[in-house]
Every structure is written in structure tokens, then in C-alpha cells.
Amino acid sequence: EVSINKKNAEDFVLWKPSSEEEPSWPSPWGKGRPGWHLECSVMSKKYLGDKFDIHGGGRDLIFPHHENEIAQSCCANDTEVFSNYWVHNGFITLSNEKMAKSQGNILKISDFKNNVNGQALRLALISAQYRQPLDWNDKLLEESQKTIDKWYKSYVVLDKPKLISDDDLYPLYDDLNTPKYIANLHKLYEKSQSGNLEDK
């Protein structure tokens, strides 16, 4: 059902009236406040300019939020482009359920800081490509810790270490394909176990 305040079903709020409890400012349309999409466009313009390089957010914000930001920002700034690159991350789920405060199933970094290796935590978090969902569980963290331990046990200080090749780094240039990059690191580890210092 289309709101009586809309001329078209696709219209979105630019300015809305405020209740007594909400912040408000005077305007030609009466006392009110910016709509959700406008808040973000204004902050972006203030701190980043009419156009900027990278805009990010969760996958759930692609539509309508980011689409509406683009529409109003390009119109207001008379630009063809609002952001050069859009980076939308997948959700981290817990037992295949979206984390939500209302469900009481959220994890905080502070939950891990005293008993989890930060490198293992980072490795676990990048085990899925950033656009994809990641189901968090104890096994994922345990496997990541085992991998970090394994890599460190084979660590050798070399006078002239070899740089990681462009081929091995390539997945990072391919939309930050971290799972493929980690697979390449595993292959490099296996190669380094050959006993040949040239491969380390």
C-alpha cells in the first residue's frame, strides 16, 4: 500500500517531520529532520566531497539505501557518479542464523581478546570472500589457529627471502578473493616443506 505522503510508490523520504522526542531543525517544509538516505549523502559530501573512491556497507543496504543515496547525491551534486567502487560485505552468521541484538546471538571482538590469537581470528574472518556469508563456529576458529601454528613452526629467517609471486597474490586483485589467496599460501607452505631453502 502506497503512503498518502507519496506521489509514486518508488518515492523515498528526503525530509520528514519530527516528533517531540526526536532531533529537529527548521526548514521550508516545517520542523523536521533528514530522511535516512539523506543523512548519509550529507555526511559523505561533507567529509569526502561530491564524488569519492570507495563506499561500503552490508549487502542488505544495496537497495533501497545505496540506490537512493546515488539518486539524490548525483542530482544534488550534478555528477554522473557518486562513488567509484562499491564494496558490500556478506553477513557473519552464527549457527546459520543472522546475528542480531534482539536474538541475543551476537559476538563481540571483546569476547575473544583474552583467549584467542588475533592472527587466527583474522584468518578465520577472511576464510570467506568478503561479499559472501560466513558461518561462525568454534571449528572455524580452531582450524585457523592450527593453520597459524603450522605456518609459524616452519618459519625460517632467510638472508634473502623470496617475495610472493604475482601469481600467488593475484586472487587479492580479483575482488579480494581471500579464500583463493589462503589456498595459495597453503600451497607455498607445502612447497616450503620440501627441505629446499630456495622454496622457503
Task: Identify the function of each model-found stretch.
Residues 133-136, 140-198:
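Helix-loop elements that line ligand-binding/catalytic pockets
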Residues 1-146, 152-159:
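Alpha-helical recognition segments enriched in aromatics with Gly/Pro capping
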